[in-house]
Amino acid sequence: MMFTGFPEATVQFFLDIRFHNNIAYFEENRARYERDVKAPFEAFIQELAPAMLSIDPQMELRPYRCMARLRRDVRFTKDKSPFRDHLWVLFRRAGEPREGSVMYWFELAPSGMNWGAGTWGENRQMMDILRRRIVADPDGVRNVIKQCHLTEHHMLVGGNSFKRLEVPAGVPDDLKGWYALREVYISPESTASVDVHSPQLTKRVQEDFLSLSPLYHLLRGAYEAIPP
C-alpha cells in the first residue's frame, strides 16, 4: 500500500475514541481503526523505510514494533481510559528497550503532528558520556551539531535540564545548554504549514530525519559506550 497522506478519517477516529473511550465502542469500530488508522500508519512506515535504513542498517522497521499500541497499559496510572486518542511511530535499533533509547519519532494527534530525533526519556549514563565528550572535544561536538543545519531547517533543541549542574569552565558558551541536558530531542519549530493529508508528508519528514542523522549517530556513540 502506497502512502497517500493521512485521511481525514484518521483524525476523526481519534476524536471519536476520545469521546467514546470504551472497549465496546472500539470493537464496533475496529474495521475503521484497521482501515483509517493502522493501514495509513503502516504505509507511512514503509515509505520511510529506505531512508531509515540509510541512516542505520539496524533500524527496526516492522510496523508492529514501530507503532504505538492504541490500547493503553492502565495498570499503574490514575487515568483508566483504555485507548489513546493519538498514535506515534518510533524508529530505533531492533531489540533495544524503548526507555532511554536513541530514536526518531513521528506523532499524530487531533491537535496536530510532530516529529524529530533524540532520546526516549532520560538516560543518565548516556548523557554523562556525552558530557565528557563535550569537555574533551567541544569542536567535534559543535561540528556534528552544525552538520544538522538546525537553523536552516527551523529545528529546535528540547529536553529537561539539570538546574544546578556545574558546567566545567572549559565548556564553550554555545555548548553549555547541551551540557546541562538530562535528555535531548530535536523537532521542528512548527508543523502547522505541513499538510497531513498530502502524500508529500513523508518527503518532508524524511528530509528532516536525514538532516538529523549526524546527531543520531553522536547520541548512538554515547549510548553504545555505556558499560555493560
What are these regions (language model features)?
Residues E42, Q46, D139, Q206, ...:
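Generic structural signal for well-ordered, non-transmembrane alpha-helical segments
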